[in-house]
Amino acid sequence: MSVHIYSPPPTDPNEAERERAVVDTGALQARDDAKLEAICKEACRKVRGTSSLLSVLYGDTQYVIAAYGFQAGAYSRKNSLSGHALAAGNEIFIIPDLSSDERFAENPWINGENARFRFYAASLVRPYGRLPIGVLSVLDEKMRTTFSEPERRIVISAAEDAAARIVQISQERNMSPVPSPPPRS
């Protein structure tokens, strides 16, 4: 067993309210949605990353509800890069070289225990334009010295598209079918 020293992500002071937003949107039930998967794939392809994730953070867990080049599923929030992006609260959160940032250098997703990601860019996912429920991120196994403004816009736009799709899924789930009129006798 190895011991890793890295900084777990801080928790937002409005965490309870943010978690209510996660529940209200039904985002955790949006897993396996082909359109969300396509958003991840397109963002990854456009910025030439190796992986892209749509993560929803709730409790002690990071739920990867859609991904490209990565396994969707539930992961510990204490190792979460997305938790740091969420806590930062910035429209775009970029770490050019994860291995040289003391917050992440010994994280198992960086040091090779789980993966060897070196670059990370993420944007907040805000259904209804409100509290962020998670992030859309693009990762690369190579560090980057630059991340252009058009690339930043791609990640931000993908997060906006993911938020809109989560809203659409939520609305579709909440719609009740119109009952048919009773048969005439």
Predicted regions and their residues:
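Short coil/loop residues immediately preceding or within conserved phosphate-binding loops
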Residues: 49, 120, 133
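Regulatory sensory and allosteric helical modules in signal-transduction proteins
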Residues: 51, 57, 61-65, 72-118
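A short, aliphatic-rich beta-strand micro-motif
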Residues: 118-127
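Flexible loop/coil segments at beta-strand boundaries within sensory signal-transduction domains
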Residues: 126-132, 141
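PAS (Per-ARNT-Sim) sensory domains
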Residues: 134-135, 152
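Short beta-strand-to-loop transition segments that serve as allosteric relay/switch motifs
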Residues: 136-145
